[in-house]
């Protein structure tokens, strides 16, 4: 007899989320945690909220607030120790929702320790001297920072987004190796706190996976705030000379106080003995089908193990699909079309669907691209954020294929376009939806109306027909 319906191998936020979802199916669920998950995303995002608060405080000076106080906006800053404490509290509150105690109350068997798959003779998981037998297994181990092989890096010492809480003071000079989303966010964050920040990437620009124009605009904002961006540059060596850290980046030698590595993430498979039970994988991701099954049909995977950006909401979606297949019938397929994500710089970058480059590759000249700036939007004028950018990519039949938004609230704005893509809606539907005036969301309507206008110009027969109809009405009135 089997012990469980599903055993979840966790050690990540995704693993705990998956256990909470699985408990709603009223089966027998076990969560194995080889290690306690690090809630670095909650901590990192809480720090960014502090930077957002600092920005808002500076904006209030222009409205006459803080009368009688120091009026030099440039002197406003964060107290690093207080910011760290607040971020830790915020991360703890976020993680408390799926604490081990709460999961146990939901009926989940929580098991601490490392395990490995065995065939005795059937598939099972051995952990702490126990053999756990289950109908299915879900791999949700999360990921760890990818550390590039750089001479002297380990001896020099470095930080990652997971060890940022160990930073005792704001570094005067900070070098960031790699340009993943968290690295870009933190480059701007520390620049706003007064650090001299240099970010070093091998690509031609930051955020190479994103739409080029949107990525260049984010890079321009960082550079305007004092961040030095070294593109197409490889870090050759790091070392400590007379107590000072040095980086050899291309033909430049940089003296820095701290080094932050933000070169992406890689799955941590632990020593699960996966190859013995027929699971194929490489150092970067598992081999999964559309149902999120591995090459062993009784073992599923989700989250960072699937590759792509390490966003929690995408991992949670994958866990939902995998658990539907496990607890119901294996007929549900993962569909990434219409799943949005955002990079929380200032302004933010929100993205969904295809980039301009991808759309041209898939559809050729059958696409239309509509771009607008936020220059003439009243809300953007009030916020002083007129450098925003909105791009909508459509098939010529009106079906929405993708969007990129750069604005202070892009992470909120992108949702309506994501829903439209998810439901297969056309841009005419967006054009028919009134937007609240004096909000950034008015941009949805502006772009949709611009698309309609451009196509009405192309359909000259329609314009001629309407003009003739109006002439006929005037004649007979």
Task: Identify the function of each model-found stretch.
Residues 7-9, 115, 123, 131-142, ...:
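Short hydrophobic core segments
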Residues 156-168, 258-328:
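FAD-site-proximal beta/loop scaffold in flavoenzymes
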Residues 110, 139, 160, 229-231, ...:
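A structural signal for the hydrophobic beta-strands that form the central parallel beta-sheet
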Residues 2-4, 9-52, 346-347, 352, ...:
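Flexible, glycine-rich terminal cap/loop adjacent to redox cofactors
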Residues 141-196, 275-277, 281-291, 295:
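Glycine-rich dinucleotide-binding loop and its adjacent helix/turn
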Residues 2-4, 20-148, 154-170, 206-207, ...:
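Glycine-rich flavin
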Residues 171-175, 181-241, 250, 312, ...:
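Rossmann-like dinucleotide-binding cores of NAD(P)H-dependent redox enzymes
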Residues 10-13, 177-180, 210, 304:
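Glycine-rich Rossmann-fold phosphate-binding loop(s) that bind the pyrophosphate
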């Amino acid at each position: 007899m089997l012990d469980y319906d599903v055993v979840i191998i966790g050690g990540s936020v995704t693993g705990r989320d998956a256990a909470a979802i699985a408990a709603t199916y009223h089966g027998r669920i076990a969560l194995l945690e080889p290690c306690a998950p690090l809630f670095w995303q909650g901590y990192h995002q809480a720090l960014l909220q502090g930077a957002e608060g600092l920005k808002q405080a500076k904006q209030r000076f222009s409205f006459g607030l803080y009368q009688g106080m120091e009026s030099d906006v440039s002197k406003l800053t964060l107290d690093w120790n207080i910011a760290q404490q607040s971020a830790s509290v915020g991360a703890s509150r976020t993680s408390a929702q799926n604490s081990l105690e709460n999961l146990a109350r939901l009926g989940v068997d929580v098991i601490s320790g490392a395990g490995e798959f065995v065939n005795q003779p059937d598939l099972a998981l051995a952990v702490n001297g126990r053999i756990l037998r289950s109908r299915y297994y879900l791999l949700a181990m999360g990921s760890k920072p990818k550390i590039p092989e750089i001479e002297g890096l380990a001896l020099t010492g470095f930080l990652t987004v997971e060890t940022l809480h160990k930073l005792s003071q704001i570094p005067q000079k900070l070098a960031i190796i790699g340009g993943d989303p968290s690295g870009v966010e933190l480059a701007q964050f520390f620049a706003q706190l007064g650090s001299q920040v240099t970010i070093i990437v091998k690509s031609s620009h930051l955020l190479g996976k994103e739409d080029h124009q949107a990525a260049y605009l984010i890079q321009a904002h960082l550079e305007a705030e004092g961040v030095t961006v070294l593109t197409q540059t490889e870090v050759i060596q790091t070392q400590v000379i007379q107590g000072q850290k040095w980086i050899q980046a291309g033909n430049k030698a940089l003296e820095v106080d701290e080094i932050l590595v933000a070169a992406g993430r890689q799955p941590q498979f632990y020593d699960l003995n996966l190859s013995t039970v027929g699971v194929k994988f490489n150092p970067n991701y598992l081999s999964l089908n559309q149902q999120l099954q591995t090459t062993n049909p009784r073992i599923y995977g989700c989250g960072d193990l699937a590759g792509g950006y390490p966003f929690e909401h995408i991992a949670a979606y994958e866990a939902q699909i995998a658990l539907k297949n496990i607890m119901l019938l294996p007929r549900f397929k993962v569909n990434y079309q219409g799943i949005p994500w955002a990079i929380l710089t200032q302004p933010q970058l929100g993205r969904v669907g295809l980039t301009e480059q991808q759309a041209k590759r898939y559809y050729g000249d059958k696409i239309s691209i509509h771009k607008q700036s936020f220059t003439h939007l009243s809300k953007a004028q009030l916020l002083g954020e007129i450098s925003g950018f909105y791009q909508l990519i459509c098939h010529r039949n009106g079906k929405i294929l993708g969007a990129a938004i750069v604005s202070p609230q892009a992470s909120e704005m992108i949702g309506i376009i994501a829903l439209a893509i998810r439901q297969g809606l056309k841009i005419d539907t967006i054009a028919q939806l009134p937007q609240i005036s004096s909000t950034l969301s008015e941009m949805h309507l502006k772009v949709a109306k611009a698309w309609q206008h451009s196509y009405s110009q192309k359909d000259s027969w329609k314009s001629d027909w309407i003009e003739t109809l109006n002439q006929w009405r005037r004649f007979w009135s």
